[in-house]
Amino acid sequence: MRSTILLFCLLGSTRSLPQLKPALGLPPTKLAPDQGTLPNQQQSNQVFPSLSLIPLTQMLTLGPDLHLLNPAAGMTPGTQTHPLTLGGLNVQQQLHPHVLPIFVTQLGAQGTILSSEELPQIFTSLIIHSLFPGGILPTSQAGANPDVQDGSLPAGGAGVNPATQGTPAGRLPTPSGTDDDFAVTTPAGIQRSTHAIEEATTESANGIQ
């Protein structure tokens, strides 16, 4: 009987006491509206402590590399940020536009990935649009000579040889039979074909007479 009375007394005294947290030993405090997400982040960090150490950005950053490859274009690498939710965490993930990676693989009969010896030669690539804006020449200027771009050429003179620009239209320089006109030096021991043809014609003429 005495034990039951003591139990009721103890229960009444514990109910009158404020509710305390068993782990912290502090009374609960009211949180502001801005502080409502802090316990969720703390709980997620306690459950997954390694989430804060995982880099959530892409390994391949093409923006600074393109700026180094083509500094004259003056392009600024544009990035897009997309929210990524992991439990209670809100992380901004950076994604570069116009880059679509393609991963090619081949599965076996039972859904297992084949080894490199059994796989054929498969290429992986990146589809990149507008790699160098302003750096691609139009088709009309692709084969233009840089020495001729400053001056204006007449019609039909794009592929004119500079040695024959001074000659009249329709007349091309013809060989006169002498080596001095073209300043051609024939190596010793090699006879020009024109001299051989002339000797053959003179011998045939002498044989006819």
From Swiss-Prot:
Organism of origin: Homo sapiens (Human)
A GO biological-process term: positive regulation of enamel mineralization
Residue ranges, annotated region (Disordered): 142-209
Coiled-coil ranges per UniProt: none
Entry keyword annotation includes Glycoprotein: yes
Signal peptide: 1-16
Superkingdom in the source lineage: Eukaryota
Functional summary from the UniProt entry: Is a promoter of calcium phosphate mineralization, playing a critical role in the formation of the compact, mineralized, aprismatic enamel surface layer during the maturation stage of amelogenesis.
This protein's UniProt keywords: Amelogenesis imperfecta, Biomineralization, Cell adhesion, Glycoprotein, Secreted, Signal
UniProt family annotation: Belongs to the amelotin family.
Disease (UniProt): Amelogenesis imperfecta 3B: An autosomal dominant form of amelogenesis imperfecta, a defect of enamel formation. AI3B is characterized by hypomineralized enamel that has reduced tickness and exhibits structural defects.
Protein name per the record: Amelotin
Entry PTM: Phosphorylated by FAM20C in vitro. O-glycosylated.
